[in-house]
Regions:
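Soluble extracytoplasmic regions of secretory-pathway and membrane proteins
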Residues: 1-328
């Protein structure tokens, strides 16, 4: 049992709590911060509400919903955060490649309260940013969980769609980030073969100023750098310095820890037995330009320290990992 606990990093501390059998008013007052942040809204309810009320245009999808605590109006509040990603499965090839190239901002809902009608209470939902409580300066999401297609930016006679405001005016934008590559015909032909999309080579929409953005799925992007880690399938977003970042948890595993109990896990469609696991890496991905940083969060993990020796130039090692969340 001890070996298994060590291998899985299970640290259980038993604590006895004195309970009188009744709750007094002063006890409630002392713990009002805890009581105010008790989750009463179910995640699935938020997902359903988003699908019913926020996807009427068909351009966006909200599959990544996660709990997060933000300081809103001077008070810590437990919320659900859902990045607004572009829906690429229901629109045409030209639209998703040249116009609907990116998602737009985040929706934030309260996890601790509902409206008077019992519906989900949205704290931030306006795509134009009029209720931008986290002060996001760059809301566009070019890299995410749903971004599985190539995007071409700065094309001839086409601008990228941002949103339509309440007056019916379409707002557009041209990508000016560091990501993407500017290529000629032969390079486009190679990319077309690699992506099994000959239209990239044959199109007349691409100019010398255009950029082709590939490898936009953040999980696949991280795997391409460190393929030996296991990556969480439910990354979440945070806001730092006005920018949206994805946080992707990564795990090291082994099946060779002495005397530890085996567990069967399924990953990438295959099953394997492991008896050691550590959540020793966090990957931070900029949602706008795809820049990735790998942070070691557990320096006592011998597996990740071995990777550091082999691929030291790929990982930034920190004694303490912390990303400050922008708040209002």
């Amino acid at each position: 049992i001890k070996s298994t606990q060590e291998a899985y990093n299970i640290k259980v501390k038993e604590t006895s709590i004195d309970y009188s059998g009744t709750i007094k008013e002063d006890e409630v007052e002392k713990n009002d911060d805890v009581i105010d942040n008790i989750t009463i809204v179910n995640k699935n309810l938020v997902k359903k509400s988003l699908k019913d009320t926020q996807t009427e245009t068909g351009y966006y999808i909200y599959n990544s919903v996660s709990l997060a605590k933000y300081n809103i109006n001077g008070k810590d509040q437990l919320t659900y955060v859902a990045p607004r990603e572009a829906e690429n499965n229901t629109i045409s090839y030209n639209n998703k490649t040249y116009e609907y190239t990116h998602g737009m901002g985040q929706i934030i809902a309260s996890a601790t309260s509902v409206t008077e009608d019992g519906n989900v209470e949205y704290l931030q939902k306006d795509i134009s940013g009029s209720d931008n409580i986290l002060e996001v300066k760059e809301p566009r999401i070019y890299y995410g969980v749903e971004t599985n297609s190539v995007a071409v930016t700065n094309t001839k006679n086409k601008s990228e769609y941002d949103y339509t405001d309440s007056d019916g005016v379409e707002h557009v934008n041209n990508y000016d980030g560091n990501s993407g590559i500017q290529v000629g015909f032969w390079d486009r032909l190679i990319l077309a073969v690699k992506n099994k999309d000959i239209r990239l080579a044959m199109t007349s929409s691409i100019s010398s100023e255009s950029k082709i953005i590939t490898n936009r799925n953040i999980v696949k992007r991280a795997k391409a750098v460190l393929p030996n880690l296991i990556y969480d399938e439910n990354p979440y977003t945070v806001v730092d310095d006005g920018k949206i970042y994805w946080v992707l948890d990564a795990y090291t595993v082994s099946d060779k820890y002495p005397y530890s109990t085996y567990t069967e896990v399924e990953y990438d469609g295959a099953k394997r037995n492991i008896n050691y696991i550590r959540n020793s890496v966090k990957v931070i991905i900029n949602a706008y330009d795809g820049e990735m940083t790998f942070y070691i969060t557990d320096r006592n993990d011998p597996v990740i320290m071995a990777y550091l020796t082999l691929r030291y130039f790929l990982i930034i090692q920190e004694k303490k990992f912390q990303m400050e969340l922008s708040n209002k």
